[in-house]
């Protein structure tokens, strides 16, 4: 269930980001509203990037397990430096 929620959160964040971009591109927002939308867009972009990074790291963990696909919870402490 957590995976579905994370995927939905990513999908919703991406959809929200696309909607913000469309509103900004239309040029109908005031300067203040444009700045607010831009700030929201930056937050959404960071959220999406974080979700993509975690997914990429999980794929790497799955592929690096002696040729066997095993799934483990992602932990920042396991990241190679």
UniProtKB/Swiss-Prot annotation:
Q: Does the keyword Cell membrane apply?
A: no
What molecular functions are annotated in GO for this chain?
exodeoxyribonuclease VII activity
Q: Name one GO cellular component term.
A: cytosol
Q: Which InterPro entries match?
A: Exonuc_VII_S, Exonuc_VII_ssu_sf
Catalytic reactions on record: Exonucleolytic cleavage in either 5'- to 3'- or 3'- to 5'-direction to yield nucleoside 5'-phosphates
> What does the record give as EC number?
3.1.11.6
Q: Which Pfam families match?
A: Exonuc_VII_S
Question: Which of UniProt's keywords are assigned here?
Answer: Cytoplasm, Exonuclease, Hydrolase, Nuclease
Q: From the Swiss-Prot or TrEMBL record, state where the protein is found.
A: Cytoplasm
Q: What class of enzyme is it?
A: hydrolase
According to its UniProt entry, one GO biological process term is: DNA catabolic process
Assembly with partners or alone: Heterooligomer composed of large and small subunits.
Q: What does this protein do?
A: Bidirectionally degrades single-stranded DNA into large acid-insoluble oligonucleotides, which are then degraded further into small acid-soluble oligonucleotides.
Q: Which family does it belong to?
A: Belongs to the XseB family.
What is the name of this protein? Exodeoxyribonuclease 7 small subunit
What would be the name of the gene that encodes this protein?
xseB
């Amino acid at each position: 269930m957590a995976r579905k929620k994370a995927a939905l959160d990513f999908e919703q964040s991406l959809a929200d980001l696309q909607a913000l971009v469309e509103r900004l591109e239309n040029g109908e927002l005031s300067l203040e509203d444009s700045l607010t939308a831009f700030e929201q867009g930056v937050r959404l972009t960071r959220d999406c990037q974080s979700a993509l990074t975690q997914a990429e790291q999980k794929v790497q963990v799955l592929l690096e397990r002696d040729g066997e696909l095993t799934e483990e919870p992602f932990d920042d402490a396991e990241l190679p430096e």
